[in-house]
Amino acid sequence: MIDNNQTCAAGQDSVPYVTCMIYVLEEWLGVEQLEDYLNFANHLLWVFTPLILLILPYFTIFLLYLTIIFLHIYKRKNVLKEAYSHNLWDGARKTVATLWDGHAAVWHGYEVHGMEKIPEGAALIIFYHGAIPIDFYYFMAKIFIQKGRTCRVVADHFVFKIPGFSLLLDVFCALHGPREKCVEILRSGHLLAISPGGVREALLSDETYNIIWGNRKGFAQVAIDAKVPIIPMFTQNIREGFRSLGGTRLFKWLYEKFRYPFAPMYGGFPVKLRTFLGDPIPYDPKVTAEELAEKTKNAVQALIDKHQRIPGNIRSALLDRFHKEQKAH
């Protein structure tokens, strides 16, 4: 009786090429019914893919907690040095920035375009808020590594209530306002970042990349009071990396009621992420806060129109990993 490999070797047309390859692999690996194993593995992949996509966003939170654990260890190790050094946390910041920069390069092929537009002095960076602002974490890492500067950021109040986050927020200079504090930071020559859309934009915006700022113009008044330029910022494909289900009526109501992002997220896709910094909007004492806010919104929208395909597509965003630069759409 002729075995499977002999049948393939005989060149019989009735035996498909793929089937022959399976027979060869069965003999080479010393297993039987390899095709059944492959079918079973494919079935497992089909079953668990939705679960994996729901877990990956929380892996980012896991990385944040690993960062916090590292900072606590670092703090204990250097407890005696703290009384003698004003730069205790610089080593920790550099280590964390290097780790996040490595993650950005491997998982997203992360790039920043327009870094030269950031001045040596103070500036207010205004950015579009993704479902998870992982692009801003990467951007802060780049700023610290390349320029040795910490970019302060205004975070939502709920972030300060997350257990364990206080040390992380302190080390990386996050604040929740008020306006006077933001002006003070800018007048001291620091970089400050604000997303006017905040959590609402994170939850309610989608693959159409609609900007949800409402009538917010406080950030513009901050720039006017501090007499600093505004730099618009947008990250290509940020909505394809992570998606939010916050657009449903239930989760909208929950957010408006409790001001807490209850909406689940999915994703963690290794899409290409490119952060683009627009031309600085210079300080002009003749411009009102309303006019400056509208001008800034238009600048961010211009970056979206130039660099982002609408609607966003996860498959295309994955393929962007293999292109040097995406065409303007």
Curated annotation (Swiss-Prot):
What do the Gene Ontology cellular component annotations say?
endoplasmic reticulum membrane
Q: Where does the UniProt annotation place the signal sequence?
A: none
Organism's domain of life? Eukaryota
Which one of the record's GO molecular function terms can you name? Answer: phospholipid:diacylglycerol acyltransferase activity
Keywords attached to this entry: Acyltransferase, Endoplasmic reticulum, Glycoprotein, Lipid metabolism, Membrane, Transferase, Transmembrane, Transmembrane helix
Q: In which tissues is it expressed?
A: Widely expressed, with highest level in the brain, followed by lung and duodenum, and lowest levels in tongue, testis, skin and ileum.
Q: How is its activity regulated?
A: Acyltransferase activity is specifically inhibited by TMX1 at the endoplasmic reticulum, restricting accumulation of triacylglycerol.
Which GO biological process entries does UniProt record here?
A: triglyceride biosynthetic process
EC annotation from Swiss-Prot or TrEMBL = 2.3.1.-, 2.3.1.20, 2.3.1.22
Q: Say yes or no: keyword Lyase present.
A: no
Catalytic reaction(s) noted = a 1,2-diacylglycerol + a 1,2-diacyl-sn-glycero-3-phosphocholine = a triacylglycerol + a 1-acyl-sn-glycero-3-phosphocholine; a 1-O-alkyl-2-acyl-sn-glycero-3-phosphocholine + a 1,2-diacylglycerol = a 1-O-alkyl-sn-glycero-3-phosphocholine + a triacylglycerol; a 2-acylglycerol + an acyl-CoA = a 1,2-diacylglycerol + CoA; an acyl-CoA + a 1,2-diacyl-sn-glycerol = a triacyl-sn-glycerol + CoA
The protein's recorded glycosylation sites are: N5
Give the residue spans that cross the bilayer: 51-71, 121-141
Q: Which residues form the active site?
A: H129
**What's its membrane topology?**
Multi-pass membrane protein
Lumenal-facing ranges: 1-50, 142-329
Q: What does this protein do?
A: Catalytic subunit of the alternative triglyceride biosynthesis pathway, which mediates formation of triacylglycerol from diacylglycerol and membrane phospholipids. Synthesizes triacylglycerol at the expense of membrane phospholipids, such as phosphatidylcholine (PC) and its ether-linked form (ePC), thereby altering the composition of membranes. The alternative triglyceride biosynthesis pathway is probably required to provide the energy required for rapid growth when fuel sources are limiting. It maintains mitochondrial function during periods of extracellular lipid starvation.
Q: Which family does it belong to?
A: Belongs to the diacylglycerol acyltransferase family. Highly divergent.
The protein's name in its UniProt record: DGAT1/2-independent enzyme synthesizing storage lipids
Which species does the entry assign this protein to? Answer: Mus musculus (Mouse)
Q: Which gene encodes it?
A: Tmem68
